[in-house]
């Protein structure tokens, strides 16, 4: 499945947050969206997930898609997993998204079992979600979206509140979902444990001004991309020594990562 954005814009209180955005997202791929705070990253994810109605054209496999159709095909996962906990047990939390679809109990049980296996939560069906670790809560949020048989996941800083081992767990889940044919679109700058991303999109002033591989991204210069983020990518490319030479010669000093 492919989502196509054609001259998509979004205004808030009359001011453009996104303007004339053109992009394509395919299943079986991982897309990382970067840019400074307020550049429109979260707005883009919410438009893709059908949570905001935008100007312009959005297509699913070439056919026009309204927000309702997007919500059926794109699951949105918030930064704070606790904000999505609804049920008193893990299985009830997943079941909630299925009940509103009108599925019978047999089909619900099959889907719950499948998605909990996919995210590594088998055996915790009767647990209180509030007692789960941060990483487990985030996996539960992902499972709840997958239970609806969404083709894409849009995740807004899904690991920013987690410790490194939990970050690794979440990225391993996302990579396995990519291999299952899901499309993954996420905002993050925590890249140490994400080994299988396909594309990086850079947003500046509400417009996507770059979409390409991370090898291509590190060769470009962006005023709002901080040195620690570049360092992570150079390390992934196996070019860290070359990057350090550039860094030392530039006279720059490392600053806090803001992408």
From Swiss-Prot:
It is found in: Cell inner membrane. ATP binds at residues 38-43. The active site is at 157 (proton acceptor). SMART domains: AAA. GO terms for cellular component: ATP-binding cassette (ABC) transporter complex; plasma membrane. Keywords: ATP-binding, Cell inner membrane, Cell membrane, Membrane, Nucleotide-binding, Translocase, Transport. Residues 3-230 form the ABC transporter domain. Pfam families: ABC_tran (PF00005). Its EC number is 7.-.-.-. This is Energy-coupling factor transporter ATP-binding protein EcfA1. It comes from Thermotoga maritima (strain ATCC 43589 / DSM 3109 / JCM 10099 / NBRC 100826 / MSB8). The gene is ecfA1.
